[in-house]
């Protein structure tokens, strides 16, 4: 999809332009991409770059939240030369609101400019190395 004039494009999201109907702007995003992104952050080991962690040591304090996060599953699907994880609700497990909210919050952070170096535009500074020029190259 090509951006329309006035839109702000981002990583698998775009913010509508200022000329939107009734002056209301919205953010549209690829739900499958971002749910996969959040799931990868949760699977990343605590303390590693890009991990998403939760406060406390007692998992029962987050039982309802984690229940919502397990309310969907993904199926890898191939199309247009790539593989995409397509997320779907689990049967008999309708409550996924907090999973959707967590995903939306991560998208909102991206819209605000927060990024991991592996997916964002932020570059990692490389250490400069001093090298000696060969004798046959004039200095």
Regions found by a protein language model. Give the residues of each.
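P-loop NTPase catalytic cores that bind/hydrolyze ATP
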Residues: 92-112
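Aromatic-residue detector
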Residues: 69, 87, 103-104, 136
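Mg2+-dependent endonuclease catalytic cores in nucleic-acid-processing enzymes, primarily RNase H-like
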Residues: 1-82, 112-115, 124-139
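Short, solvent-exposed helix-loop connector elements
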Residues: 81-93
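Hydrophobic helices that insert into or interface with lipid environments
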Residues: 119-120
